[in-house]
Amino acid sequence: MAKAKFQRTKPHVNIGTIGHIDHGKTTLTAAITKVLHDRFPDLNPFTPFDQIDKAPEERQRGITISIAHVEYQTEARHYAHVDCPGHADYIKNMITGAAQMDGAILVVAATDGPMPQTKEHVLLARQVGVPYIVVALNKTDMVDDEEILELVELEVRELLTEYEFPGDDVPVVKVSALRALEGDPRWTRSVLELLDAVDEFVPEPVRDVDRPFLMPIEDVFTITGRGTVVTGRIERGTLNVNTEVEIIGIHEQRTRTTVTGIEMFRKLLDEGRAGENVGLLLRGVKREQVERGQVVIRPGSVTPHTQFEAQAYILSKDEGGRHTPFFENYRPQFYFRTTDVTGVVTLPKGTEMVMPGDNTAMHVQLIQPIAMEEGLKFAIREGGRTVGAGQVTRIVK
């Protein structure tokens, strides 16, 4: 029995199962934990099906979502895996980014082939930027005819190509999650093959620390005799003292300045890193030149915009959302990072109105510029109450 070493240095990757209801996403998730537990018991606890199926509810940007989080390790990597029990939970998770995915395992039952939710999940994966997909062709123990399996595989590949994934190159692995869970050696091997494919095909993500510096401003104050300080949580990158930065968003003009001090918990630091809450002392900047809602960035790394296309989920009445549909020219607030900005909504051709509980594409024109990139998340609010959540899929202007 090979004993795998636990290494903190193992690369960490976020993954999730997507696909049509009853195609076996949760069974596969349980099977992965069992197979890896049997292979490397000191690294992997086994998480049974019913524990994953009764996923706890989480609140993300005011939306309640059931998400099951499981962790496991292959020889090469450490994975955090998300599985959602209900279809609506998937849609909400993917749009709000409650659990970010560096890659997804698309589960398709060989007995059915691609179904409506298979398509919806693949489309959403494309729109919200899930970069890589590996296919688990599940329940293949129930299909005796090789030709049928080949046809289903072809259909899945065509579907992926249609939504701009590399359908010809994506690994498609034939598995039986249920039989693997029962301990059948042949199907246990199939799950290990699937994990090998994920190890190989889904690249390591670029860590937040290695990306260009960005910090949303939460608060601004003046320290007498020293100057203006902005505080916030560093979203990504690192920042050293005496580095030049740019402050953008909300106003037309951008402010260039140098950070002369970085403070955390009243201590001075040489550098601030992604995930830390810090105060930045800015040279020659007046208190009234900066405000909450702007961002401090590495100069030129991000630009402010007012028009974008987005994919959004609108809360149902039961979730505390609107009780009535909205129409063209709807004017809610869009909450980006730390602030609300009013925007005007244009609906896609053929969509007359959007009902509570729907997900929809939309075009938005903001009244003030916001520092944004594709993939940026936002909440849709009316007077401080969250009525929806979404993310930028394309910047228009």
UniProtKB/Swiss-Prot annotation:
Residues the record lists as binding Mg(2+): 26
GO terms, molecular function: GTP binding; GTPase activity; translation elongation factor activity
Start and end residues of each stretch annotated as G3: 83-86
Region (G5): 176-178
Catalytic activity: GTP + H2O = GDP + phosphate + H(+)
Subcellular location: Cytoplasm
The keyword Metal-binding appears for this protein: yes
EC number: 3.6.5.3
Region described as G1: 19-26
GO CC annotation terms, alphabetical: cytosol
Binding site for GTP: 19-26, 83-87, 138-141
Enzyme class: hydrolase
Residue numbers spanned by region G2: 62-66
Swiss-Prot/TrEMBL keywords: Cytoplasm, Elongation factor, GTP-binding, Hydrolase, Magnesium, Metal-binding, Nucleotide-binding, Protein biosynthesis
InterPro entries, sorted: EF-Tu_GTP-bd, EF-Tu_GTPase, EFTu-like_2, EFTU_2, G_TR_CS, P-loop_NTPase, Small_GTP-bd, T_Tr_GTP-bd_dom
Region (G4): 138-141
Presence of the UniProt keyword Magnesium in the record: yes
Lineage: superkingdom: Bacteria
Pfam assignment, any one: GTP_EFTU
All residue ranges annotated as the tr-type G domain in the record: 10-206
Gene3D superfamilies for the chain: P-loop containing nucleotide triphosphate hydrolases (3.40.50.300), Translation factors (2.40.30.10)
Cited function: GTP hydrolase that promotes the GTP-dependent binding of aminoacyl-tRNA to the A-site of ribosomes during protein biosynthesis.
Similarity comment: family membership: Belongs to the TRAFAC class translation factor GTPase superfamily. Classic translation factor GTPase family. EF-Tu/EF-1A subfamily.
Subunit and partners: Monomer.
Protein name: Elongation factor Tu-2
Organism of provenance: Streptomyces ramocissimus
